[in-house]
Amino acid sequence: MASPPRGWGCGELLLPFMLLGTLCEPGSGQIRYSMPEELDKGSFVGNIAKDLGLEPQELAQRGVRIVSRGRTQLFALNPRSGSLVTAGRIDREELCAQSPLCVVNFNILVENKMKIYGVEVEIIDINDNFPRFRDEELKVKVNENAAAGTRLVLPFARDADVGVNSLRSYQLSSNLHFSLDVVIGTDGQKYPELVLEQPLDREKETVHDLLLTALDGGDPVLSGTTHIRVTVLDANDNAPLFTPSEYSVSVPENIPVGTRLLMLTATDPDEGINGKLTYSFRNEEEKISETFQLDSNLGEISTLQSLDYEESRFYLMEVVAQDGGALVASAKVVVTVQDVNDNAPEVILTSLTSSLSEDCLPGTVIALFSVHDGDSGENGEIACSIPRNLPFKLEKSVDNYYHLVTTRDLDREETSDYNITLTVMDHGTPPLSTESHIPLKVADVNDNPPNFPQASYSTSVPENNPRGVSIFSVTAHDPDSGDNARVTYSLAEDTFQGAPLSSYVSINSDTGVLYALRSFDYEQLRDLQLWVTASDSGNPPLSSNVSLSLFVLDQNDNTPEILYPALPTDGSTGVELAPRSAEPGYLVTKVVAVDKDSGQNAWLSYRLLKASEPGLFAVGLHTGEVRTARALLDRDALKQSLVVAVEDHGQPPLSATVTVTVAVADRIPDILADLGSIKTPIDPEDLDLTLYLVVAVAAVSCVFLAFVIVLLVLRLRRWHKSRLLQAEGSRLAGVPASHFVGVDGVRAFLQTYSHEVSLTADSRKSHLIFPQPNYADTLLSEESCEKSEPLLMSDKVDANKEERRVQQAPPNTDWRFSQAQRPGTSGSQNGDDTGTWPNNQFDTEMLQAMILASASEAADGSSTLGGGAGTMGLSARYGPQFTLQHVPDYRQNVYIPGSNATLTNAAGKRDGKAPAGGNGNKKKSGKKEKK
């Protein structure tokens, strides 16, 4: 059998086939190429980059790749040249068998555009296969009495090539008895038959050897041969006969294995062994013998395995009936396989985007997929669908490819991920369907600012809070995810009371907890207005603000402060006066107190905590007024000591106490006589302070005395010189020496400083007052100096006292008290100028000293008798009324339960000046002395 080389003739056909490979139609979305089979791996098929409108280097950048369904990749892309090349040798006969047109379809995917192009490559057949008989030798039997024209069926040859390269003709070697006739069957196959031309004579020649040659139409021509041995038999008059000679049957592809398809019947009129027929497949192919079974006695054809329409749509076979005399008859059988909807549609995902940003535009491609159904006709028609309530749709692409695209904007906060159910269904009966799930995550975009649950917040913190204590917590929610939802908190920059807001409070940037950076004082700070900003960590970040009102709650941290009577600072005791003639309810004094707190913590109540004479005095609960509870009796002591407690209404309540000393007397001498017995407890620390003050005053006094002595000496020397000059010059009579130094010079010095001895309840302890401006020009006169000069004539005090006892001068009318200055119930009693007031020189001088001390105290705001400025240490009724000029104004915090009165600041009572009438009287006294 001839077997020419496979590559023979291929080189001559390569050039025209390469030219065919450049044919394409890029404008239609379907690219077509042609190429010959059996090219080497990497052979050029077409310039795919050019046909796609791309540069070669863009193939990799754009993700261009080949996609095909369930088939070994026959082609590849050359990224350097942009060409479509073969991935290996392509055998057309293996790929397409006897199909006259061999076309390979696949798709080119441009990944970044989610666009797909169809590519069709036609494989051109070359003459690389020679005709081939199944058997190299065939034995044929024929009766010797066979008539001329008897036909014997010969085996036919097969050529895997198609077209002009397929089988064209047969040739029979030359002989005397037989000729060759070629019959074309209904399937287009050429069947050779041996025709008897001359009668046979078994006795002359028993065996005839012939050579049958099959030729194709290629160039060069390829051929195949088989050897035929014809054996001459004795006579068999009748040959078998099929009626009809061709059989056809259609069966569904899903018939069970072993199903009988049809029964062939042949007849032979001979008898005996010559009439017994046996059936067999002629030229039995392996595929036929594996699929079908032929009963050799009955001629019944049945299935050996399942039929598959998608694998083979029909089967062509030839059945031979042979009798015992070697006569045969043949019949052709065509089994057509009918398609059954037994294949569910198939979904093949070609490209998929697993995550999509929520700000993508409508029409964005999510996935590219293809569908396939192995059935045909309506059974192979496919419909695709997805749920209607999703923001997606399907768009048909080339062939059976579809795009899954968005139809509207996506919102991750509404739906963060989708599981898209893709349903493909064929049109068969019953229809078959397949579901495929396409997952899609929606990537977050920072499109939502943090959101506070409330438009504003308010909270409170008690004053005196510890530093670093947690005040409040705010929380904002961001519906985004990841960094876009990570919220940080901050406070808006601001200043309060000259200090940055960040020095008052801070906020934890992660938790939103506010902390106090200082201890708040309600009396200084009552509320703070803050703006809290919540910002996410997106790009760009989004933020929102909320207002926070922080209120400081008052705590009862301030004890009541007693304004009147003022607490003494020098150990002296203030004295209030109550006449023995006072009736019950007589107003002795009023305790005035304030509390820096507010509200209930500032409500004050007064009570008498302790009294030397219980039941004699009562204190108003809400007013603080000290009044007599009963009439004063003679047996009541001159000095009454009251301890008044002032208490607020806080929790727990705080209180303060003050000791009020009340002098019970109708006359000043009675008061003065007992002043020495009024003492106040002295703190040891006050004694130390007093000692230091005494030492300091003593030192200053020594310096002052030295200066005065030097001044007096100078004055005496000047005066002595002037007297000598007068004696020598004018010889005038001498003037007697005065007992005093010149008062004019001393008074000039006293205009600057003076030392005073204060008569207080503790006068026996020699309290001294610091140097202060002198009021000698208004309180002293030359006459008073002649009467008593304690600074110059201290050694003559006792003599002067004794002289005054003997020679009592008439009282000085300049020191007589006016009606407004006399004791009484705050000027409520009338009387004349000559009352029970000082009627001797001793009383007058005592009152002068007291007035001098009071005037000095009024100048510096001190009080030696505890009565306050300008009170002479007696009572507010005997001097200027109590003023609040040196006290902080807390009147807005004072609430007096049970009374509508509020504290006022009367300008007329704050100047602390003595009555004008007193000063005028002193000036008149000076004029009299000058006269």
Curated annotation (Swiss-Prot):
Residues 30-692 are extracellular. Residues 30-133, 134-242, 243-347, 348-452, 453-562, 570-683 form the Cadherin domain. The chain crosses the membrane at residues 693-713. Residues 714-931 are cytoplasmic. It is found in: Cell membrane. GO terms for molecular function: calcium ion binding. SUPFAM superfamilies: Cadherin-like (SSF49313). It is a single-pass type I membrane protein. Residues 809-840 have a biased composition (Polar residues). Glycans are attached at residues 419, 545. Residues 1-29 form the signal peptide. GO terms for cellular component: plasma membrane. GO terms for biological process: cell adhesion; homophilic cell adhesion via plasma membrane adhesion molecules; nervous system development. Keywords: Calcium, Cell adhesion, Cell membrane, Glycoprotein, Membrane, Repeat, Signal, Transmembrane, Transmembrane helix. Residues 800-840, 901-931 are annotated as: Disordered. Residues 921-931 have a biased composition (Basic residues). Its main location: membrane. Potential calcium-dependent cell-adhesion protein. May be involved in the establishment and maintenance of specific neuronal connections in the brain. This is Protocadherin gamma-A5. It comes from Pan troglodytes. The lineage of its organism: Eukaryota, Metazoa, Chordata, Craniata, Vertebrata. The gene is PCDHGA5.
